[in-house]
From Swiss-Prot:
GO molecular-function terms, A-Z: ATP binding; proton-transporting ATP synthase activity, rotational mechanism
Record-linked InterPro entries: ATP_F1_dsu/esu_C_sf, ATP_synth_F1_dsu/esu, ATP_synth_F1_dsu/esu_N, ATP_synth_F1_esu_C, ATPsynth_dsu/esu_N
Keyword annotations: ATP synthesis, Cell membrane, CF(1), Hydrogen ion transport, Ion transport, Membrane, Transport
Gene this chain is encoded by: atpC
Taxonomic source organism: Streptococcus mutans serotype c (strain ATCC 700610 / UA159)
SUPFAM superfamilies: Epsilon subunit of F1F0-ATP synthase C-terminal domain, Epsilon subunit of F1F0-ATP synthase N-terminal domain
Chief location bin: membrane
Topology relative to the membrane: Peripheral membrane protein
UniProt protein name: ATP synthase epsilon chain
Assembly mode: F-type ATPases have 2 components, CF(1) - the catalytic core - and CF(0) - the membrane proton channel. CF(1) has five subunits: alpha(3), beta(3), gamma(1), delta(1), epsilon(1). CF(0) has three main subunits: a, b and c.
Amino acid sequence: MAEMTVQIVTPDGLKYDHHAKFILVKTPNGELGVLANHENLIAPLEVHEMKIKRIDDDSHVDWVAVNGGIIEIKDNLVTIVADSAERERDIDLSRAERAKKRAEKAIEEAKEQHRIDEVQRAQVALRRALNRINVGSK
């Protein structure tokens, strides 16, 4: 079966490097499924749960919380460059829950003070926290 290499890179370094037969990512235009031999592509990514089906076993799926970034597909190498990314096994759920509560509180306070920029920043923080919670709970 054809395969591709999937690498996820953040400012902290290489977070993921494995062979896969399928990945699913989310772009601003919707979900994008990628198989081996996909045509070359560069696209922006949303905050999302990335699904990676590994080649070793049909039931072996890795989940990664990706916080935006870009995807490049070229010659069966899929590279994700993101601000941050965490595998399900590396997510501290209690920390993610605390981040969610902080973001919810920040949204309420910013709304009361009519600070639109702060509301938007807190909403992004909330999306990231919820993404980490969803992936960490898998």
